[in-house]
Amino acid sequence: GAIQSAEPAKRLIQVLPLDLRSRLDLALVFSSGNSTTENFNALGESKLRQKNGEHKATFLRNTEKVEEITSKDLVDVSYGYKRFFSPVWYASLNTNFFRDELKDIDQRLTLSAGAGYQVFNTSSSALSTELGLSSVQERLAGENKSSPALRWGIDFQRYFLDRKAEAFYRQSLLAIAEEGRGQVITSSTGLRYALSDRVDAALRADLNYETNPPIGAESIDLTYSLGVGIRF
């Protein structure tokens, strides 16, 4: 009976092979003394690989309070799909939601379509880049704006020490067509070291840069985090 009940699952896996990998990086800082600081940083990633395609979703949440006053409150959610039509070339679809209300970015929704190139993909390293056209819907300081844009993305991983250590860099650059809006760059750079099969230490730098930010906001927002990562 148990063998028969397992047969449908085996057939499903054969028809629709799944290679799903997810991880969650967490960093929490609390300090007190002359001032009290609370910082929470969470990065979640999930990647599903198929025969000719790949789905990837990411979620970043970053908050900071100093003396009970919120000094950072950022949300960044992305989804991307790759459809390979050759061993190295692929079509790409991407969507991103970004919010940083303390910089008067009430929301930024980006929809992109384009093409990408897998520069290399080996057991020790991988690099891909893509270029596409985007539609950017923004609400800045309560004002709604809509603009076309050009998007350039990079995704790089390098493994060391029999894949126990990983260096990575991810970048998305938006060149927004609206006059005076300029470019928006988001990136994550970091190192991970495996402490066990499921847990690793994670050091990461997250950058948000705007050439022409809303009035009163800084161009650069750079966050460093040191925490633990869980793979599942």
Task: Tell what function each PLM region has.
Residues 28-32, 50, 61-65, 97-101, ...:
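Transmembrane beta-strands of outer-membrane beta-barrel pores
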Residues 26-28, 57-63, 77-81, 93-97, ...:
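Transmembrane beta-barrel strands of outer-membrane/channel proteins
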Residues 51-57, 88-91, 123-127, 159-167, ...:
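Repeated loop/turn-to-beta-strand initiation elements of outer-membrane beta-barrel proteins
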Residues 1-27, 31, 36, 41-45:
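Compositionally biased alpha-helical segments
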Residues 124-175:
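Detector for outer-membrane/organellar transmembrane beta-barrel domains
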Residues 25-27, 43-45, 80, 114-119, ...:
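Outer-membrane beta-barrel architecture
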Residues 112, 220-232:
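Outer-membrane beta-barrel "beta-signal"
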Residues 30-38, 66-72, 100-107, 140-146, ...:
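Solvent-exposed loop/turn segments connecting transmembrane beta-strands
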